[in-house]
Amino acid sequence: MQIRELAERILFGDRWEEKLVALDRYEDSAPGTAFVVPERPGRPVGLGLDEWHGREKMRFRDVGKLHSERERGLVLHFFANHELLALELMALALLKFPDAPQKFRRGVVQTLKDEQEHVRMYRRRMEEIGVEFGQIP
């Protein structure tokens, strides 16, 4: 798969299959032209940035008050949001800077893959304790 195709799927995908697409081998022979920054990334239902307007915001939990699995799951939700945004920013960097040195682009791809794995881990743990990704603005 071309790096550009991967980055576009991640940045604009509105399904987890797109955001977390596995990448074993990739090519960078067609990086294309520099990309214009979109207004917002594509997101799975419930996680769209525009969907959070008007919803009550939750404050980050006080670490000393994390007595239940559910409370810990809500903290994981905050972390998972951070990882998802980092994943999308790595994809954007690949699209925005197609002429960057190959070593840099390969490093960004590796970071992107790491962020995908972090999102997977958070989603798995949240699912185990009954917290759905997207339920907290």
Across the structure, where does each feature detected by a protein language model lie?
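Non-heme di-metal
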Residues: M1-P137
